[in-house]
């Protein structure tokens, strides 16, 4: 399988899967996403890590933190101020009748460019430079109801694999040894995530109970 990641820059939303395979090669892995498409993951060269979202044999999403894309004029290592001078980041996303306020702590911006949403990620420790981006068609993005996906084992495993890839791309950039998969570490991380989720749910419930109690006292 000959991989040519330099051709990734020419892949665009709407291209077909055959074009992708013929230009950059077969993926190292195919992951589930929180949307209806699957990520074709290219991680053989971590300095040129990229993912292509494929739905019904067509490209609906692109991600990279190592290669620019001709689909957008935002380039890696650009400054956040430069991006914001050119585009106005979205302040909220509307899902049905609900508006979800975007509060990114200046770590990313979501831009509306043509028929796509573009999420631009910034490295707040490196002069707020663009360190990655995700392009997704509005049609593909609309398949997610709300902001957060429904969890399942396959999606969890995909997120875990992608997290390891992203950590290793950063380690590669900083000339550090890459991390290998550890079942023990994965089990520990899952347990920690479950504990945190339970704590968050409890905090939300406690807040709701307090609000209800205050309202009940006022009525009395």
PLM segments and residue spans:
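Functional surface patches built around histidine and acidic residues
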Residues: 1-220
């Amino acid at each position: 399988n000959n991989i040519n990641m330099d051709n990734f820059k020419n892949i665009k939303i709407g291209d077909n899967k055959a074009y992708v395979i013929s230009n950059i090669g077969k993926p190292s892995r195919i992951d589930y996403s929180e949307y209806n498409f699957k990520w074709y993951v290219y991680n053989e060269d971590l300095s040129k890590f990229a993912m292509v979202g494929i739905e019904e044999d067509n490209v609906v999403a692109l991600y990279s933190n190592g290669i620019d894309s001709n689909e957008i004029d935002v380039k890696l290592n650009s400054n956040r101020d430069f991006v914001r001078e050119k585009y106005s980041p979205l302040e909220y996303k509307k899902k049905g009748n609900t508006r979800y306020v975007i509060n990114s702590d200046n770590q990313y911006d979501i831009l509306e460019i043509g028929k796509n949403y573009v999420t631009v990620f910034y490295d707040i420790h490196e002069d707020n430079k663009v360190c990655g981006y995700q392009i997704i068609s509005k049609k593909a993005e609309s398949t997610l109801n709300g902001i957060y996906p429904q969890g399942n084992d396959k999606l969890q495993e995909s997120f875990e694999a992608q997290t390891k890839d992203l950590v290793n791309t950063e380690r590669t950039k900083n000339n550090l040894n890459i991390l290998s998969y550890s079942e023990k570490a994965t089990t520990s991380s899952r347990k920690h995530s479950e504990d945190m989720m339970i704590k968050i749910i409890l905090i939300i419930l406690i807040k709701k109970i307090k609000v209800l109690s205050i309202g009940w006292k006022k009525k009395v």
